[in-house]
Swiss-Prot record:
Part of the ABC transporter complex NikABCDE involved in nickel import. Responsible for energy coupling to the transport system. The gene is nikE. Signal peptide: none annotated. Its EC number is 7.2.2.11. SUPFAM superfamilies: P-loop containing nucleoside triphosphate hydrolases (SSF52540). This is Nickel import ATP-binding protein NikE. Keywords: ATP-binding, Cell inner membrane, Cell membrane, Ion transport, Membrane, Nickel, Nickel transport, Nucleotide-binding, Translocase, Transport. PROSITE patterns: ABC_TRANSPORTER_1, ABC_TRANSPORTER_2, NIKE. Residues 4-252 form the ABC transporter domain. One of its GO terms (molecular function) is ABC-type nickel transporter activity. Belongs to the ABC transporter superfamily. Nickel importer (TC 3.A.1.5.3) family. The complex is composed of two ATP-binding proteins (NikD and NikE), two transmembrane proteins (NikB and NikC) and a solute-binding protein (NikA). It holds the Pfam family ABC_tran. PANTHER family: D,D-DIPEPTIDE TRANSPORT ATP-BINDING PROTEIN DDPF-RELATED, TRANSPORT ATP-BINDING PROTEIN.
Length: 266
């Protein structure tokens, strides 16, 4: 059984203008995907193709117009209050914009402790122990707990968001362009940390990105998305064999590791 799946998902947004006219835009067209326990799947596509919309549907932040999202085989719409609380614990989302994903006036301690307050019954002492454990896990010093988001670096803030996602021992983390704003060294560090956590805890990842280079480093299976549809599914080891035009464009957009000097011809 899949950990999480989307079955024939359609998402249509309807907008209304000031003069009363309305417009319908279909963002997702008949999407079906599944992710197994401990698996890393990449969702690859250009900006605006519907990747983030699908991510929000998978974590229950939005509902599909038609189709079902299922967690351990049960539709999210069938979960009762306790079932939805368990789902919130087991499926976490890390956003691209880490400064926008946290309260600028909250301490790091409060940010990491937020899911512990809402999704567990831990008392204050045990919450503090868990926060310190998480800081060690993401390799941050204990004193950072008293700082505000503006007092830490971008790489540190992304690790804080990872720690918050890990706080309630999730089975699946959806990373929505979560390392795209980091420089290449911080990206490598974040991916190494996520890989280590997966090896230790069996976490599954859905890695949402436009960067094929990162897919090659992190995922085992790749779903290519274009204009709200999954247009290709391929193993990461076979990425050079991608056939769809959208897939080839993404492959061609990957920069070489070093600038290529043009060869002069006479």
């Amino acid at each position: 059984m899949s950990l999480i799946s989307a079955d024939n998902i359609v998402k249509i947004y309807q907008s209304h203008s000031l003069v009363g006219a309305s417009a319908r835009k279909t963002m997702l067209h008949d999407i079906s995907i599944s992710i197994g326990q401990g698996e890393t799947v990449a969702l690859l596509g250009r900006s605006g193709c519907g990747k983030s919309t699908l991510a929000r549907l998978l974590v229950g932040l939005e509902r599909p117009t038609s189709g079902e999202v299922r967690f351990r085989g049960v539709p999210l719409t069938k979960l009762d209050r306790s079932g939805m609380k368990a789902f919130r614990r087991e499926v976490q989302l890390i956003f691209q914009d880490s400064p926008g994903a946290v309260n600028a006036r909250s301490s790091v301690r409060a940010i990491i402790g937020e899911p512990l307050r809402h999704l567990t019954s831990l008392d204050e002492t045990r919450r503090e122990e868990r926060i310190q454990e998480l800081l060690r896990l993401v390799e941050l010093p204990p004193e950072i707990a008293d700082r505000l988001p503006a007092q830490v670096s971008g790489g540190q803030l992304q690790r804080i968001c990872i720690a918050r996602a890990l706080a309630v021992n999730p089975k699946l983390i959806i990373l929505d362009e979560a390392v795209s704003n980091l420089d290449i060294h911080l990206q490598a560090s974040a991916l190494a940390l996520l890989t280590k956590l997966q090896q230790e805890g069996g976490i599954a990842y859905l890695f949402v990105t436009h960067d094929l280079r990162l897919v090659q480093k992190f995922a085992a299976r790749c779903l290519v998305m274009d204009e709200g549809q999954i247009v290709e599914e391929i193993k990461t080891a076979d990425l050079d064999s991608m056939r769809h035009p959208a897939s080839r464009l993404l492959r061609e957009a990957v920069l070489p590791p070093l600038p290529v000097r043009a060869v002069e011809t006479n």
